[in-house]
Curated annotation (Swiss-Prot):
Biased composition (Basic and acidic residues): 1-15, 59-75, 195-213
Residue stretches of biased makeup (Low complexity): 30-57
Origin superkingdom: Eukaryota
Protein name as it appears in the record: Protein CDV3 homolog B
Key words, A-Z: Acetylation, Cytoplasm
Family stated for the protein in its record: Belongs to the CDV3 family.
Length: 242
């Protein structure tokens, strides 16, 4: 168990050392590309002159690179934006002159209409149409026609409008009084039918019975016409004697 742990630790440290070496090599190459190392304070004149010449060469290279880049960009832009020149085509063989003439006429007519509309607005709507056409010809003066005078209709002031069918049959209505609340004809009810039947029965009963209005008059009539007396004797007594 101890051996694999030691191997894994060794591998880990070996990988870390490799990474450090790579980082150091990359930083050194970047420093070389930036330019020559700056000499120390105690350097000789020859080392200083070599440092200055190397720095000047680096500046010239950067300038030349910068000067070349805009030319390349301009060339690329010219390649991308190419002007398209349309070729002129001869349409004389297609006989399009008639179409062009008709279009010109329509344009002229539209311009005339716009001018006439402006004149009409300025004149307050009473401008005359100056364009030529059959609708602008002045009509010939016709002979004056004798106007037939019609009899004026009588003017009715006030009143209520009535249709012609109702005008002929006009009936005068009598003034009506207030409605009778207790009348069965104007205000019918379910009880009215029952009362009607009772009134018929009362009339039939009146025919059989006499109505006494005066006391003395009824007694006088009874004295004049005496009622027949009933026979109280036994009619079968004769049979008993035999």
């Amino acid at each position: 168990m101890a051996e694999p742990e030691e191997r894994s630790l060794d591998d880990f440290f070996a990988k870390r050392d490799k990474k450090k070496k790579k980082d150091k090599g990359g930083s050194g190459s970047a420093a070389g590309s930036r330019g020559p190392a700056r000499p120390s304070d105690g350097a000789t004149s020859s080392s200083l002159s070599s440092y200055v010449s190397a720095a000047g060469k680096g500046v010239k290279k950067e300038k030349s690179g910068k000067s070349e880049n805009p030319d390349q960009l301009q060339e690329k832009e010219e390649d991308e934006w190419k002007e398209f020149e349309q070729k002129e085509v001869d349409y004389s063989g297609l006989r399009l002159q008639s179409l062009q003439i008709s279009n010109e006429k329509e344009d002229d007519e539209n311009e005339n209409k716009e001018e006439q509309g402006a004149d009409w607005e300025e004149s307050g709507g009473f401008g005359s149409d100056k364009s030529s056409g059959p609708w602008n010809k002045t009509a010939q003066a016709q002979a004056p026609i004798s106007a037939v005078e019609e009899a004026p209709e009588p003017v009715h002031t006030g009143g209520v409008y009535r249709p012609p069918g109702a005008r002929a049959s006009v009936t005068t209505r009598k003034p009506q009084g207030p409605p009778e609340i207790y009348s069965d004809t104007q205000f019918p009810s379910p009880q009215a039918t029952a009362k009607h039947t009772e009134s018929r029965r009362e009339k039939e009963m009146e025919k059989t019975f006499e109505i006494v209005k005066h006391k003395n008059r009824a007694s006088n009539e009874a004295a004049k016409n005496p009622a027949p007396r009933p026979q109280l004797d036994n009619q079968y007594a004769v049979l008993g004697e035999q």
